[in-house]
């Protein structure tokens, strides 16, 4: 159990120690621990559902850095997010769903964030 904890802390790359208590961790650090656990168990697919909701700016940055580490490790990540700036920053592919159905699939890096926003607004008006 201690080795698992050390692996997770190593993934986090910050000042969390084996003596840290969950109650003293920030929301971003808790998200990082959850991601680190999935990484430790070699999950092929990691699903993050609104991982930046209710987090501060610094914590959001940490979560986005975690997603980058997931990608660098070669694992697949489904990142469910409403913040298009975050999507643009980390997503290789964007699948837009409406009532559970795919309505569009695009490469976010092919557009700027304002263009992506405009595209999705237009898409919503057509629905």
Please provide the spans of the model-predicted regions.
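Glycine-rich phosphate-binding loops of nucleotide-dependent enzymes
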Residues: 1-127
């Amino acid at each position: 159990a201690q080795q698992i904890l050390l692996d997770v802390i190593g993934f986090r790359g910050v000042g969390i120690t084996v003596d840290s208590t969950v109650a003293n961790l920030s929301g971003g650090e808790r998200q990082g621990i959850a991601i680190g656990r999935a990484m430790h168990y070699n999950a092929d697919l990691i699903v993050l559902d609104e991982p930046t909701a209710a987090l501060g700016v610094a914590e959001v940055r940490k979560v986005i850095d975690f997603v980058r580490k997931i990608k660098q490790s070669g694992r697949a990540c489904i990142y469910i997010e409403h913040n298009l700036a975050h999507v643009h920053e980390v997503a290789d592919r964007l699948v837009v769903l409406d009532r559970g159905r795919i309505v569009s699939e695009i490469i976010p890096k092919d557009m700027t964030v304002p263009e992506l926003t405009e595209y999705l607004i237009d898409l919503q008006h057509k629905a």
